[in-house]
Amino acid sequence: MYTTTLSVQGMTCTSCVASIQSMLEGVEGIEQFTISLLLERAIAVHDPSIISPDQIAEKIEDCGFDASVISSTEGEHGVMANYLLLSPMQAEQWTKVHNHINELQGVLSVNCSSSPDAAIRVIYDSEITGPRSIMKEILSMGVKCTFQPVDSSTSRILSLQRGSQIRVWKIRFIISISFSLAVMFLPQIFDSCDSMRAAFLVPHYFGICAGHIISLVLSLPVQFGVGRVYYSAAYHALKRGTANMDVLVSLGSTVAFAASIFFMILYSARHADNPAPIFFDTADMLLTFVTLGRYLESKAKGSTSAALSQLLSLAPSSATIIEDNEQIEILADLIERGDLILVKPGEIIPVDGTVVEGSSYVDESSVSGEPVPVHKTIDDELLSGTANGNGRLLVKATKSPRESQLAVIVDLVQRAQISHAPIQQFADRVAGIFVPVIVALSISTFTFWFLFTKYSSKYPSVFDDPMGKFAVCLKLTISVVVVACPCALGLSTPTAVMVGTGVGALNGIIIKGGEILERLNQVDTVVFDKTGTLTVGKLSVTDISIVDNLEELLDIPKNIFWAFVKASESSSEHPIGKAITEKASEFTDVSEIGIESFNAVPGEGVDVVLRWKERTFHALLGNSLLLEHNNVSIPDDFDSKLKLSSSSGLTCVRIAIDGQFVGFLGCMDQVRPDSYQTVSALKQLGKKVCLLTGDQKATARRVAQGLEIDFSDVYAEAVPSQKAEIIQKLKDQKHCVAMVGDGINDSPSLVLADVGIAPINGSGIALESADVILVRKGVLLDTAVSFDLSRVIVKRIKMNLVWACIYNFVMIPIAMGFFLPWGIYLNPMWASAAMMFSSLSVLASSLLLRRWKKPKSLIFSEADDVETESSTNSSVLQKVYTATRSIFGRNKSSNKYQPVANEV
């Protein structure tokens, strides 16, 4: 299967989206198709053997929209596509170039045309080759070649900011407002004095006023210049059997313009003495207000994608590589795996890689949320989009730019913004019947008032118009057509989803789509994996119990004893051994301990013979079995201590030297500093919190006790399949379940849960299975933040929909003349202004989500040994949302995690 991303231009409302969606969903070979009005992007998952990317673009164009393929990649990891522009050549040389490229290692397919200046599209495996290597091969054949990146960061930013679109609509508005104001005010100027009135407002030429001819001429640029956009879109919509906002606008404008010409001809044929009623100003101002609305909408839509633009701007456009001992500056898109990249002080790292030379402090706040610059040296990993400090680094690229963690984050955010929320189905259903209903209501309005004023003598005073009752009925009809606004309904959900998911991404929370947002808001039960999620995922020594007469018993100083412990476990790869080595290093700096023999006993511990000052020592570190097999007895007082520690969830390592028991070390996986606050916050949000782990019950209950999780909600000693069964059991009890985990063994549960949540430092499988990804490393509290954010976004969506419905329910009856008996009616010009306002108000409402701040209860209160963000952090995220700086302060809270007995 291929995943093809397309650019789709010309969509104006949800009716356009619905028509394309319905056209493509039934096409053979297309497995999945989603499209975004705001991003002007479509993503198709399809079988290329049945339908090609270009054929998908053609089908979209058949609907009346401009479409082009941005990228098309196979489902396999590392498979990429790019375009290369070649110089003109003969057909024979084209064949040679095609065949040569096709034979290159890593190239999967080549599509090219024999026409001059055509582009070849190369699909390749980025783990084997890249665009720069392919270009070198083409250049070696004497053919000039230019790289044309597919969907580069720069082009995507420009597209999202809608700069060209905003300029076009601005020009259209200036043209329309200039001519419309002239058409509106010239008749008033002509009527200002008798001589001008006689010259311009009295029929002279074939019964037509000169002023009317001038108004007609001035209206032409508006109707057939600016208005052509609406008429063309309306034509294509009707051609494909649908009706959208363009149809309503075109209908209202056409009726007013055509009626004006009709009356001019009619009065001319009758040689009438009075000037004909004309509505050129109505037609022109209608288009002017709509054009102003489109201009302001374009600017507002550009703001809705500000978060995605900021993420894209993190990656640099160029990079310096070292090739043949020379520094060469290239486009960042041309970087390939294995390239050596020179990163100078202050530069942005262009691609994920590892340090091969140099050291420096790197600011990772923009990508990982780590606020304090991290020291990087040889073999350390670097992330694209992070900022180098004062050092000079030589970096080996481990991924291509489009596979970097930053690119993955951007792709996830964009896919989330393209996806449709289930609540959007309501707007889609309404949009499907909206225009036909409005047209029917407008015809009914005209018919009713025309007949009413004709056969009744008691009609509202508004019909006593110099232009006649027919003209007033026509204006009411136009008002009904124009005031109705399906756009407000259509924009309610996608704008809120786009802004909301963008805000989430900037705060380190990636929500994979509108459907996930809704489910996240419905969750009532949150299940946590223990190891690596609620806990750090790294064992540490928390309990030390050593005999009082250690030095007399062994005839060695205490620091030498710790040196023995350190040396005994230094060769161990077991997590417990590493934890003991780290703890022992705190008590000794002695290193001249010799190891004569080392034996790791599976399931028991280590058996080591040590040498110090020409003396040998036999050391045993392990569980009770190791000591039993070596005939070492444990004193009764220590035996009771061991039982107490073991029952509280500690892993106890017994220590014996030369056959004598000297004590034990208790190890455990430390609870994360913000776990208590996370659990507490979730409970405040009304969520039930459960603990699910494969560890023993004592360990699980010990963690649950410290976090105040009910023992009845603790599920211990569960293998991956049992974890999934527990999730299903909770769902069967009518709970909406969220699973939070980071390991491979959590993947089945993450998939089965209604919402899967995983930290970005989790396993690759867990990240693929998760619906929500927490980008900020080590900040579990973002789990609770994601629930609060989803609640706010869904609430905003509902507010938008309610407002859009209220607007139409109120304004349409007013336009139809329901309140004419009380002198309340709606002029077509003001109807178009109201329609514009309704769409803009929904956009403004969604943009208010950018002001969202974390509740104070969800701001992490840190211990002194935990590094987090400070108020002076200068990341891009904070530059975008300066209002959220306060959330990163070091606020103290009484809800800090309190260790239970034996933890320290």
UniProtKB/Swiss-Prot annotation:
Cu(+) binds at residues 13, 16. It is found in: Golgi apparatus, trans-Golgi network membrane. It catalyses: Cu(+)(in) + ATP + H2O = Cu(+)(out) + ADP + phosphate + H(+). One of its GO terms (cellular component) is membrane. Mg(2+) binds at residues 742, 746. Residues 2-68 form the HMA domain. The keyword Secreted does not apply. CDD domains: HMA, P-type_ATPase_Cu-like. Residues 194-197, 268-278, 453-469, 827-828 are lumenal, vesicle. Keywords: ATP-binding, Copper, Copper transport, Golgi apparatus, Ion transport, Magnesium, Membrane, Metal-binding, Nucleotide-binding, Translocase, Transmembrane, Transmembrane helix, Transport. It is a multi-pass membrane protein. It comes from the Eukaryota. It holds the Pfam family HMA. GO terms for biological process: copper ion export; copper ion homeostasis; intracellular copper ion homeostasis. The active site is at residue 529. The chain crosses the membrane at residues 173-193, 198-218, 247-267, 279-296, 432-452, 470-490, 806-826, 829-849. Residues 1-172, 219-246, 297-431, 491-805, 850-904 are cytoplasmic. One of its GO terms (molecular function) is ATP hydrolysis activity. Its main location: Golgi. The keyword Ribosomal protein does not apply. Its EC number is 7.2.2.8. Belongs to the cation transport ATPase (P-type) (TC 3.A.3) family. Type IB subfamily. Probably involved in copper transport and in the regulation of cellular copper level. Retrieves copper from the metallochaperone atx1 and incorporates it into trans-Golgi vesicles. This is Copper-transporting ATPase ccc2.
